[in-house]
Amino acid sequence: MLKDELLNQYITYIYSCSCAETLVKSGVKPTMTAGYSMGIYASLYIAGSVSFETGLLFIRKAYEAIRGSLPHDKFGMGGVIGLSEKDIRDITDHHNLDIVMVNRNSDHSFIVAGSSFHINLFLLKSREEGALHARSLGVTIPYHTSHLSEAANKLSETVYSADVVDPETPIISVLGQDLILDAGRARKEVVNNIHTPFNWLATQLQMFNSGIRIFTECGPSQALRKNSKFIPGSGKFVKWVNLVRKDRDGLMR
């Protein structure tokens, strides 16, 4: 299972970098980038902070650090849509669940992580409470939780010795919504990302408040574009392929 998760991260990274590169080569350059969860690596690459190879290195070293510090089958993650933060905390507290809310996509869309048994129980109770959607994310790693603190320390050995430079394009942190403008801050984000909860809702709203109105998702999923419909006043998401500038013959540049 873990090897499949590593392969999926490689594929997603390569796809995301390819999409973003296609846009840039056609003349569409980002004002700002943001990395949703493990999207931090592609975000750093397209911002010019790391090479493509360094991004792959970070993914592999993070996987190896996690593999060396966690049991393979005792953790998981889940997504729930249709409940409030209070609903989720009430379920967690009432059933004494060993889970953590690790991301808020919108006011009624959340990601949780923790014990696989408790994740499954949480999803069951969420459906009973009226959640519109509650499912396992199919991973065995509790990303963005303190369970990965040891792995983060191990990963830092690679990150702080790797070639990382100041980003050419500002990167907004999904952890704290501040701008990542230098190499030191970029390194810190990579290390903290795997064991710290993030907030996509706050991140997208911060980008909107900074003047950005057009967003695109460079990856195989359209989840963020769909999610944006539930964030009032957050700008417009456009499919990346629809933003690619074309030549007179209608071909991508």
Each predicted region: which residue ranges?
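Helix-rich "cap/lid" substructures immediately adjacent to catalytic or cofactor-binding pockets
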Residues: 1-34, 112
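Conserved small-residue
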Residues: 16, 39, 80, 112, ...
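Gly/Ala-rich beta-loop-alpha elbow adjacent to hydrolase catalytic centers
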Residues: 16, 31, 35-39, 43, ...
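Non-catalytic positions within long, well-ordered alpha-helices that form the structural scaffold/packing
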Residues: 24, 127, 208-209
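Short acidic/polar active-site loop segments enriched in Thr and Asp
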Residues: 29-31, 132, 213-214
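Alpha/beta catalytic cores of group-transfer enzymes, especially the acyltransferase/condensing modules
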Residues: 47-195
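A short, acidic, amphipathic alpha-helical segment used as a generic capping/interface helix at domain edges
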Residues: 194-212
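Short acidic, glycine/proline-enriched helix-loop-strand junctions
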Residues: 223-253
